[in-house]
């Protein structure tokens, strides 16, 4: 039998040795209760479990390949986060039990070791070059094989991912535009990068098999026959029945494969672009295999908190240069590699220029000393820096011994952080805040442009006239005089349009586009009836040259049927 403490979420067996220790008073049940950080981790774990359930339902309801790829990617990320959170939660529980039960409260152990500050780590400008073969990149003129790839990044128990990228042989590298930021990292961090990929045209794909076969048939049988076969296949697939030549494909979710991975540490941090080696984890027989070059290019930056946030502040007295008895009272702020001295505490918040700036770097020497106590200022702090052959020393005074100890502790902690974060404390590296993730773009149609073009018989003389006038490119500022014959029509062509300046064709030769359209006797409009023509005013007298222009005018206006 078990008794559960619902408040602390601890299960203790009745009659067990642990319960006997509780009764004897050696242990307290609160030692095994959840800490605030453990509660937050448990909340994240519950959230990812719900996200995984939603991803499974979404994957089962997907009807398009791109939707299935995104759902499978979300499912893989959720599973990775769940495993990471469970492992971290178990590790914290074990450390909590071992740390609090290994020694009794009366035991006096060694003081706690100094720990470095935390920081932020950001990776951006991720590029993975590809190495295509000549037969695949230059000589392959068939259908494009496509892959869907993304990066999974893990730092400690935190896992993030990039957007999904579609890759084919037209790309020379895989470029990820998003910046990935980890807000909680130590100087001993290990950032693991994993590249996952899935073939878009994988066997068992949701769509695409019958269409690819129809494309091949249309190209092999010819334009007319192939178009009829392709139309029959499309109609069969759209009506819900099975295609004529292929059975219904088996619906199954895509599968991502691990293609390559690498691990980046503090040594890889640099305020610039850098290349790192990749460990390939896939072979050429894998359907998701990509010709990776074996390296990844990125910018890895880090910002320790000691470089971006103040570590100590308080009232100080600074000795003026060359004056032993003249001390100026300032407000000191230790931030990054500088000790800023302001006239007033408000100046630090408003961004005013400091009165004095004292450098504090890895080469700085700090010494605490005491002057004559009769002067009333016994607690001093000396900061020395070497500038070439000269040594500059600034002497500071604190108000009490506790304030002096506080400043010394802050300075020693800063020196320890510099020794752990190394090159990250030379200067502040720029880190951009990641932009919100954009929704995934729909997959673009791929295939031959020849089969995607709708080629119809060119029996419309208006379409041919537009093509000819676009090639000529000439324009008329005013409409031609023969356009007055067609003023009774409801829609007139624009005189500035390219169609009004088409060259006059020679009607003595057969037309290359076939027989033009003619007027139908059954479809004469009311304004073109014989009665309307009998009362219409006669056109003005024209010269023979003008009459020639009327007879050889724009074919679009006098040959096109108004029906």
UniProtKB/Swiss-Prot annotation:
Keyword Nucleotide-binding (UniProt): yes
Region named Disordered: 96-116, 518-563
GO MF annotations in UniProt: GTP binding; GTPase inhibitor activity; small GTPase binding
GO BP terms, alphabetized: actomyosin contractile ring assembly; apoptotic process; mitotic cytokinesis; regulation of apoptotic process; Rho protein signal transduction; septin ring organization; signal transduction
Tissue specificity annotation: Highly expressed in prostate, moderately in kidney, heart, brain, spleen, testis, placenta, small intestine, pancreas, skeletal muscle and peripheral blood leukocytes, and weakly in ovary, colon and thymus. Weakly expressed in all normal cell lines tested. Overexpressed in various cancer cell lines.
Modified residues (Phosphoserine): 30, 106, 232, 520, 529, 543
Positions bearing Omega-N-methylarginine: 14
Domain REM-1, chain residue ranges per copy: 17-98
Signal peptide feature range: none
PROSITE patterns listed in its UniProt record: PH_DOMAIN, REM_1
Modified residues (Asymmetric dimethylarginine): 230
Entry keyword set: Apoptosis, Coiled coil, GTP-binding, Methylation, Nucleotide-binding, Phosphoprotein
Pfam families referenced in this protein's UniProt entry, alphabetically: Anillin, PH
Domain PH: residue ranges: 309-416
One GO location term (cellular component): actomyosin contractile ring
Subunit structure of this chain's protein: Interacts via its C-terminal region with the TAX1BP3 PDZ domain. This interaction facilitates Rho-mediated activation of the c-Fos serum response element (SRE). Interacts with SEPT9. Specifically binds to GTP-bound RHOA, RHOB and RHOC and inhibits their GTPase activity.
Role summary: Mediates Rho signaling to activate NF-kappa-B and may confer increased resistance to apoptosis to cells in gastric tumorigenesis. May play a novel role in the organization of septin structures.
Protein name: Rhotekin
Source species of the chain: Homo sapiens (Human)
Organism ancestry: Eukaryota, Metazoa, Chordata, Craniata, Vertebrata
